[in-house]
UniProtKB/Swiss-Prot annotation:
Keywords carried by this UniProt record: Host-virus interaction, Inhibition of host innate immune response by virus, Suppressor of RNA silencing, Viral immunoevasion
Polar residues bias locations: 1-13, 38-79
GO BP of this protein: symbiont-mediated suppression of host innate immune response
Domain of life of the source: Viruses
Stretches for region Disordered: 1-79
Keyword Magnesium: no
The name this protein goes by in its record: Protein AC4
């Protein structure tokens, strides 16, 4: 089991993010992890980033709504 744990653990840890811990020789930043999370929720992050930069949630959402309404009718076909 010692040979089993030493080799399989290294590969299994990479596959499982929950049980994966950075080793002393590896350098992992939290930014890369956040970037990976931003990909599926790009719509939510873009709205949050705008609200943080502007400081007004109502303004950013209103601007987004205006942009959506100004888009061509191909966007409204989804509704």
């Amino acid at each position: 089991m010692r040979l089993f744990s030493s080799k399989v653990n290294s590969s299994a840890q990479i596959k499982d993010c929950s049980t994966w811990y950075p080793q002393p020789g590896q350098h992992i930043s939290i930014r890369t992890f956040r970037e990976l999370n931003q990909v599926p929720t790009s719509k939510n992050t873009s709205t949050k980033m705008e609200s943080q930069s502007n400081g007004d949630n109502s303004k950013s959402t209103a601007d987004l709504q205006e942009e959506v309404s100004s888009l061509p009718t191909t966007h409204t076909q989804r509704h």
